[in-house]
Amino acid sequence: MERAIFAGGCFWCMVQPFEEQAGILSVRSGYTGGHLPNPSYEQVCAKTTGHTEAVEIIFDPEEISYKELVELYWAQTDPTDAFGQFEDRGDNYRPVIYYTTERQKEIAEQSKANLQASGRFDQPIVTTIEPAEPFYLAEDYHQGFYKKNPKRYAQSSAIRHQFLEENWS
């Protein structure tokens, strides 16, 4: 089993696309990249801890490759927006691919270069690629949010879904 960590704005919106893939064992919402151990949602939202909202994915590389996960990640984000994603603004929503191995770093960097060269976007690809740091699990009510609160999830992700349909379909 391998581990991948992606930050792409609100973690509620990052779970379902990965959970639906074969070879995914778990997708958990949490916080990473900051300086405070075990932060709360309120602390992260106050933008004082340096953390991003992220998802931790445990996957079977025999069924789905890290490269495939990175490609799926891009299709959930606006990789030209360094200051948040869609409705969610601020450093805690910045797009980041956190790598856990040097091989993951190489794959992510090549994928980013390929996306930039593709001409899909007029703006530079600004998603950062950073070494993984401790991942702190978010509170229970955030886990599987799209299943527990489908109406609120739909409302909170409307702008994202419109962008994804226009730019990735």
UniProtKB/Swiss-Prot annotation:
It catalyses: L-methionyl-[protein] + [thioredoxin]-disulfide + H2O = L-methionyl-(S)-S-oxide-[protein] + [thioredoxin]-dithiol; [thioredoxin]-disulfide + L-methionine + H2O = L-methionine (S)-S-oxide + [thioredoxin]-dithiol. It holds the Pfam family PMSR. The keyword Oxidoreductase applies. One of its GO terms (biological process) is protein modification process. Disulfide bonds: none annotated. It is an enzyme of class 1 (oxidoreductase). InterPro entries: Met_Sox_Rdtase_MsrA_dom, Met_Sox_Rdtase_MsrA_sf. Keywords: Oxidoreductase. The active site is at 10. The keyword Oxidoreductase applies. Belongs to the MsrA Met sulfoxide reductase family. HAMAP family: MsrA. This is Peptide methionine sulfoxide reductase MsrA.
